[in-house]
């Protein structure tokens, strides 16, 4: 949201994440709203992000799809991971803010915000 370009070192991650997001989008045949993706350390601190946030590496996106519940979006992401269609990573559900965090960290992490 601060308009900073993703550093060259992280662009491979953001491309892999974008590929996964496109696969998720295809499941619903609807646009994904990306609320937050790559963050600079300064922006991450301002928005209250974790100091070890995957957003800092360009590996994470907070997403929503109009008309789809957080629970349905998260369960679809989980299924796609289990099927090997997208990269294993973190899924955080934030029903009060109406978004799902998905990241491609490479290992399983689940939480509720």
Segments from the language model and where they lie:
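Active-site acidic/histidine clusters and adjacent loop/turn architecture
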Residues: 1-31
């Amino acid at each position: 949201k601060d308009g900073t370009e993703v550093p060259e070192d992280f662009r491979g991650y953001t491309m892999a994440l974008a590929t996964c997001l496109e696969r998720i989008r295809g499941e619903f045949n609807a646009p994904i709203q990306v609320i937050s993706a790559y963050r600079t350390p300064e922006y991450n601190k301002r928005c209250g992000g974790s100091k070890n946030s995957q957003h800092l590496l360009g590996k994470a996106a907070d997403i929503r799809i109009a008309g789809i519940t957080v629970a349905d979006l998260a369960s679809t992401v989980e299924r796609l991971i289990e099927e090997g269609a997208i990269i294993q990573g973190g899924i955080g559900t934030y029903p009060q803010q109406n978004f799902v965090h998905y990241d491609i960290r490479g290992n399983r992490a689940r939480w509720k915000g």
